[in-house]
Amino acid sequence: MIESENLNQEEIIKELCLCNGLSYEMVGQEGSDTSKLEMFFLGYPRIVGLSLFPNLTSLTIVAQDIKEISGLEPCLQLKELWIAECCIEKIEGLQECRNLEKLYLYFNKISKIENLEKLIKLKVLWLNHNTIKNIEGLQTLKNLKDLNLAGNLINSIGRCLDSNEQLERLNLSGNQICSFKELTNLTRLPCLKDLCLNDPQYTTNPVCLLCNYSTHVLYHLPCLQRFDTLDVSAKQIKELADTTAMKKIMYYNMRIKTLQRHLKEDLEKLNDQKCKLQKLPEERVKLFSFVKKTLERELAELKGSGKGHSDGSNNSKVTDPETLKSCETVTEEPSLQQKILAKLNALNERVTFWNKKLDEIEAIYHIEVKQKKKSHGLLIPLLLIELETVGNFHFEEGTRSDDWFNFCYELILSRFCAWDFRTYGITGVKVKRIIKVNNRILRLKFEEKFQKFLENEDMHDSESYRRMLECLFYVFDPEVSVKKKHLLQILEKGFKDSETSKLPLKKEAIIVSNSLSISECPRIEFLQQKHKDEKKISLKHELFRHGILLITKVFLGQSVQAHEKESISQSNYPMVNSVFIPRKYLLNSVMGQRNCDCSVRQCKWFVFDHDLVLPEYVVEFEYITMVKAPSLFSVFNNVILEESKKNPEVSVFSKDLKFDDEVIKMEPRIKARPKLISLDDKTILSLAKTSVYSHIVSLNLHGNSLSKLRDLSKLTGLRKLNISFNEFTCLDDVYHLYNLEYLDASHNHVITLEGFRGLMKLKHLDLSWNQLKKSGNEINMLCKHTTSLLTLDIQHNPWQKPATLRLSVIGRLKTLTHLNGVFISEEEATAAMKFIAGTRITQLSLLRHSSTKEERPRILSIWPSAKILTQVSKLGPHLHLSGNCYLKITALNLDGQHLFEITNLEKLENLKWASFSNNNLTKMEGLESCINLEELTLDGNCISKIEGISKMTKLTRLSINNNLLTGWEEHTFDNMLHLHSLSLENNRITSLSGLQKSFTLVELYISNNYIAVNQEMHNLKGLCNLVILDMCGNIIIWNQENYRLFVIFHLPELKALDGIPIEPSETDSAKDLFGGRLTSDMIAERQGHSNFKQMQELNWTSSSIRTVDLIPVDQFRNVCNVNLQNNHLTSFSGLIYLPNVKVLCLNYNHIESIMPRLKPQTHLTSRQLLYQKVPSSGYGQQGISKTNRDIMSSENLPPIMHSLEVLHLGYNGICNLIQLQLNRLRNLKFLFLQGNEISQVEGLDNLVVLQELVVDHNRIRSFNDSAFAKPSSLLALHLEENRLRELGKLQSLVKLEKLFLGYNKIQDITELEKLDVISTLRELTVYGNPICRKMLHRHMLIFRLPNLQMLDGSPVNSDDRAKAEFHLAELQAKKNSLIPVTHSPMDGRSFGQVKTPPIEITNVLLPSGFSHYLGSDVTLTPEVEEFLGATFQDQIECNCLKRNEHTPRNSPV
């Protein structure tokens, strides 16, 4: 046997030598010179003969039938080993190959990475195409650079590669990796440059099928040069991935902030309701406390009657039991004292009763707050998972409008049977919230396995398999409450092995049910057993009242009923997918006579394959019980509020209120004393019933109206002072009472203890029922100036940090024995000391909460970098911080350390990321040395002003939410050139001034502040990078109508507003609503201030204005000149409300009427609509009655703009003056309407003071009867460049002095003769008319208008008049001699004074020259023609010059 093996080995070595060109006979001599051997495709079944090659460095064995690695012990120099495409099942036999650098074991049957610990020089390791399930055994391979694990069964990465920091190339293609979180583990490989997860040669990893796969990898691994065999070294690719990731982070940060805001709003509603509920008990407590203190004063005075002062040694309240007993022994007026004591006892009982009610309300409030937080607490983690998975995990909160919501709702109701829950007092179920979860990762697994079942079955059975899909409730372990973390793990990762229920009989499977009772009753039973000793039934219901259901999609597959005696496991049911148990066989089933058949259908299933149970819906529900749940919004509590005031007899507290009245009316009934407003010497002595100040040791000023304690400095012996129920806001006046031991300042309005000092002997202090807020400041004052204090009461004050107040006070005031009436135990004092010790920044706290990481980890998270870094890598308390170590600290997270101030950070010069959230900080001090800060978080403190950070020029993120901020220092943000996120939510900020230069700002969260004025938005208009703005909860939302559109219009770059993405339709609506709108905000923005009262002129031309909305109008009362030329106004809009406007210029607009026109009537035809717009068209004209109606309606409208005198409406396209409603401008003096489309002068009858009317360049042909029907004050009328042919209807213009008729179509001289009715006319133009071709018009007009001083731009003098008379007389004479006329000639002197008939000349021929200008009906002699021709030529030259000089009139200013 041995000989055959040796013979076989010899043949193998011969084959080895043959394949590598070596001589078998000489191998003993030549073997030492061989460094490389190769064996391909059979002939080498075992590794043998390598001892012959001691210097071998490379060995390649491919496609051999080798089953194990052996025989390599002699190969001490081996550096490269290939054993590929063999049958190797285990990595072994390599321990001696310590110089190995490259190892190729691909295409084998290896299932585990092992025995590589000693190969520390290994650089390349290929284990692809094996059956490896886990990455392990690589910890010692520090030099590994190339690792190929493709084509295996690996589903997780974990931290197994953390030690391989030199790794440059990694191939994990063809595995079962399905989670993005697994890929983030690769971020700890700093040298990784080539990563392959989706190599085309292998099957696809499930993770590669997810959305945003490439983006996720490239963002987390920015140093990659090649990814999935592609070159990704281009800078643009990395920038795109970074930009996408940044947008995702911003988006989810916005959504999380929106959720937090909604939670805060809900909690504020609860708090408001609590305050309303507490109002009645508080009023009762105050009333009884007042009466009680009044009686105590009476009792003290009664005991001290006959004495000059009361016993100052009695510092305890007289209502203490010991005092009451001692008082009973007093013999002086025993009956009165007994009555007082009896009434005091009754009052104490009532105070206790109402205090108990206050405590009950507080308890219910805390229960509801806890429930609200629990309900909201699931949403934020879901959003974080959604961010981490880059949207592959998505959830949606349902509403009644969603079909899937209604489906789930009906499913729950259909599977609830009241019979099953009757024993627990449950009558129904109320669904509060349904969350739909879409986990793409789990869904792919589910669909993949489901598809395999379908493929393995015949087509005929596929439909039956689909019917095996069910929606079932997951059955949680009843003995373990549903923790948020556990539920989130199921939703994100599915039902893993660790999630299987370990129930009796070792039932190992995912348990689901189609019955609510099967899912829930075990939990209810367990909770009842656990708390069976509780006495209150309502409390028992509260244990299980709220619950969570997880609805899953389940593929039951082949399902059989469970056998009674066999445990439910896959081994007992090998051929099935699930096992079910009907309800009647369940051990905990409560069976009995039932009125329904629900139990027949109720089953519990056990599903073996976890991937076939897909979580889809999370349902939050509440059981409806016979005992109603205590709620701040219950009917009972509302009755407390309303009915107690309106109808005490019906109120639920009616008996208590009656009892209160009876107690108040008990004897003795103390008469009210007159209230003191001020204090003087006489009053003090009178109250103390003594004449010597030094004798006064007790002074009771209870129940007055005092706000100051003057003249108390003389009371040097005062030991006891009661100033309760007064009007004090501070206690400055008691600082000099050095002997004071007892001070009662309750029920006042004290807001600060500043000035409260020097009371070293004070032992009892009552500050309850005041307005103290700043716990840190007030505790400091008490600590410094009340060193002997024993009892302190600070209840019922609006403290800023009430949760830690008690520990803070006890820890600082070490002499205290009682706080708020409760004894301070040693344990509580010790806990308080530890608490105070932790409120200071020490070296130990720096070590525990800091990190030295140089770069922020690339993690998709919205949490502050300081929080992330200190969780990833802390320094640890065991280290010692030297001076150099301080400089290494880059991140510091001191959240929730109850700090009162920031100290000891002077050496942290390189600090980049810091967080001090949820502390007691009141100032931003102690950060002066941290000028390299990039992120600073100060949420949840008591800071009132942003200061001291102007030098932090590298700051990129600043968050100061939930503080008391009212503003910031000037120029705080001017130098922050990298600031892109600013969050100032839930503060008291009133202005955004100071943010104008924050040009890099991308996100601004400033919800729930006090911003009220629209102008504040203009401070953000220059921030072109701002894409997310949250202004929710500010006053501007209610002050500004259409607030959302207002902000969108003014900040067009925004992508999201108030947590809601901006839709394109909203942008369009904003432009329609606010585009071209002149508002006070726009004016304030341009002026830089909003003091509009100083404005006298408003000049806003060429700004696309469509409407004017200047509010408040009273602010613009001094504006007298308005110029809005070249805009898009269609009416006067808001200008009509400006009270003192005198000059209004609206040229080049689209004015249709003074007031906005109503929409056209729908019943009008298209032709009628055309006539409304262009009356000259003649289409659709409705007759005179319509015009008359317009005139009547215009005349009946009330006048407006009483101060307006000058109006410019040129070039507006006006065609109808009646629709313009100019009659309402009764005081108008100058009206300019040039360049329009006016065809009729009408609708101006009421303008009785109008002096100048300009209608040049219009379409006027003639004047109708109503044009100038009434006598007018018009002095100048401009009608140039129209279409006038007639000049009638001007007789009412009795005061007209200037008339401009140039460039019309007047061709009949008889029309000019009609002007002689205007005897006042001084200036006239008619050039450019056809009549001007006949030179007779000038002489005729000069002759007929005796007052004319200017004609066609030329002055008219006496010579012109003489020439006119001469030429006209000569013309008349020649006419009489040449032409027979039908009328007798007139006396030449009467030409121009008396209207004469027109000249008629017939049958006269002009051969040439001038005659053609006069028309065919006039013929002149050659002499007359020669004279008139020369004159006409001169006149043409003159008129051309005048026309060039003549332009349309400008507005008088």
From Swiss-Prot:
<feature type="repeat" description="LRR 30">
    <location>
        <begin position="1365"/>
        <end position="1388"/>
    </location>
</feature>
<dbReference type="InterPro" id="IPR001611">
    <property type="entry name" value="Leu-rich_rpt"/>
</dbReference>
<dbReference type="InterPro" id="IPR003591">
    <property type="entry name" value="Leu-rich_rpt_typical-subtyp"/>
</dbReference>
<feature type="repeat" description="LRR 5">
    <location>
        <begin position="166"/>
        <end position="188"/>
    </location>
</feature>
<feature type="repeat" description="LRR 29">
    <location>
        <begin position="1319"/>
        <end position="1345"/>
    </location>
</feature>
<dbReference type="Pfam" id="PF12799">
    <property type="entry name" value="LRR_4"/>
</dbReference>
<dbReference type="InterPro" id="IPR050836">
    <property type="entry name" value="SDS22/Internalin_LRR"/>
</dbReference>
<protein>
    <recommendedName>
        <fullName>Leucine-rich repeat-containing protein 9</fullName>
    </recommendedName>
</protein>
<feature type="repeat" description="LRR 6">
    <location>
        <begin position="224"/>
        <end position="248"/>
    </location>
</feature>
<feature type="repeat" description="LRR 15">
    <location>
        <begin position="886"/>
        <end position="908"/>
    </location>
</feature>
<feature type="repeat" description="LRR 22">
    <location>
        <begin position="1116"/>
        <end position="1138"/>
    </location>
</feature>
<feature type="repeat" description="LRR 14">
    <location>
        <begin position="786"/>
        <end position="812"/>
    </location>
</feature>
<feature type="repeat" description="LRR 9">
    <location>
        <begin position="671"/>
        <end position="693"/>
    </location>
</feature>
<dbReference type="GO" id="GO:0005737">
    <property type="term" value="C:cytoplasm"/>
</dbReference>
<feature type="repeat" description="LRR 16">
    <location>
        <begin position="909"/>
        <end position="930"/>
    </location>
</feature>
<dbReference type="InterPro" id="IPR025875">
    <property type="entry name" value="Leu-rich_rpt_4"/>
</dbReference>
<feature type="repeat" description="LRR 2">
    <location>
        <begin position="97"/>
        <end position="119"/>
    </location>
</feature>
<feature type="repeat" description="LRR 8">
    <location>
        <begin position="344"/>
        <end position="367"/>
    </location>
</feature>
<dbReference type="Pfam" id="PF14580">
    <property type="entry name" value="LRR_9"/>
</dbReference>
<feature type="repeat" description="LRR 23">
    <location>
        <begin position="1139"/>
        <end position="1161"/>
    </location>
</feature>
<keyword id="KW-0677">Repeat</keyword>
<feature type="repeat" description="LRR 27">
    <location>
        <begin position="1272"/>
        <end position="1292"/>
    </location>
</feature>
<dbReference type="Pfam" id="PF13855">
    <property type="entry name" value="LRR_8"/>
</dbReference>
<feature type="repeat" description="LRR 17">
    <location>
        <begin position="931"/>
        <end position="952"/>
    </location>
</feature>
<feature type="repeat" description="LRR 3">
    <location>
        <begin position="120"/>
        <end position="141"/>
    </location>
</feature>
<feature type="repeat" description="LRR 21">
    <location>
        <begin position="1092"/>
        <end position="1115"/>
    </location>
</feature>
<feature type="region of interest" description="Disordered">
    <location>
        <begin position="302"/>
        <end position="321"/>
    </location>
</feature>
<feature type="repeat" description="LRR 4">
    <location>
        <begin position="142"/>
        <end position="164"/>
    </location>
</feature>
<feature type="repeat" description="LRR 10">
    <location>
        <begin position="694"/>
        <end position="715"/>
    </location>
</feature>
<feature type="repeat" description="LRR 7">
    <location>
        <begin position="264"/>
        <end position="287"/>
    </location>
</feature>
<dbReference type="InterPro" id="IPR032675">
    <property type="entry name" value="LRR_dom_sf"/>
</dbReference>
<feature type="repeat" description="LRR 24">
    <location>
        <begin position="1201"/>
        <end position="1224"/>
    </location>
</feature>
<feature type="repeat" description="LRR 25">
    <location>
        <begin position="1225"/>
        <end position="1247"/>
    </location>
</feature>
<feature type="repeat" description="LRR 20">
    <location>
        <begin position="1023"/>
        <end position="1048"/>
    </location>
</feature>
<feature type="repeat" description="LRR 12">
    <location>
        <begin position="739"/>
        <end position="758"/>
    </location>
</feature>
<feature type="repeat" description="LRR 26">
    <location>
        <begin position="1248"/>
        <end position="1270"/>
    </location>
</feature>
<feature type="repeat" description="LRR 11">
    <location>
        <begin position="716"/>
        <end position="737"/>
    </location>
</feature>
<feature type="repeat" description="LRR 18">
    <location>
        <begin position="953"/>
        <end position="975"/>
    </location>
</feature>
<keyword id="KW-0433">Leucine-rich repeat</keyword>
<feature type="repeat" description="LRR 28">
    <location>
        <begin position="1293"/>
        <end position="1317"/>
    </location>
</feature>
<feature type="repeat" description="LRR 1">
    <location>
        <begin position="53"/>
        <end position="78"/>
    </location>
</feature>
<feature type="repeat" description="LRR 13">
    <location>
        <begin position="759"/>
        <end position="784"/>
    </location>
</feature>
